[in-house]
């Protein structure tokens, strides 16, 4: 039986590390992408089963090459600026990393007919200030640039 392949984009953060550990336990081949292969988390560097892959999420040729090389069954998109507070002072990078990077992946997957699942990690920040139980159908009204960037990536992913 052929081994299942996963790519974790932005996989050196908290979600990426946890996801990679779970997938390795399920015997997946796991590729973790990062902006730089220097000074990364010890758990990532020490795990010889993980493949660490340098990737520019704004370069569609690099994305295409990654997908062609590894032919993943699933792509997890965890890349991006993750602080609502920092998003006010770094609006451009927040938008680019959370929305444009995600959009680039989806466009490359669609254009090249790659047969893989795509999971984009969203955030409760897409709903803004809400006091009720949140449902997927709840009104989406982000109150910061981070929430807006995550909402835009959520909308193009669904």
Regions found by a protein language model. Give the residues of each.
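N-terminal Rossmann NAD(P)H-binding glycine-rich loop of SDR-like oxidoreductase domains
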Residues: 4-26
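Short alpha-helical oligomerization interface
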Residues: 84-101, 134-142
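Active-site helix of classical SDR
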Residues: 145, 149-152
């Amino acid at each position: 039986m052929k081994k299942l392949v996963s790519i974790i984009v932005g996989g050196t953060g908290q979600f990426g590390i946890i996801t990679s550990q779970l997938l390795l336990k399920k015997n997946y081949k796991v590729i973790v992408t990062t902006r730089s292969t220097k000074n990364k988390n010890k758990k990532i560097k020490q795990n010889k089963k993980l493949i660490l892959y340098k990737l520019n999420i704004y370069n569609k040729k690099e994305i295409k090459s990654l997908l062609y090389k590894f032919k993943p069954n699933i792509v997890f998109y965890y890349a991006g600026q993750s602080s609502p507070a920092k998003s006010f002072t770094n609006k451009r990078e927040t938008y680019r990393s959370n929305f444009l990077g995600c959009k680039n992946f989806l466009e490359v997957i669609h254009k090249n007919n790659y047969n893989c699942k795509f999971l984009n990690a969203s955030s409760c920040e897409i709903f803004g200030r809400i006091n009720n139980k949140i449902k997927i159908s709840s009104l989406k009204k982000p109150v910061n640039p981070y929430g807006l960037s995550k909402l835009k990536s959520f909308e193009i992913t669904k």
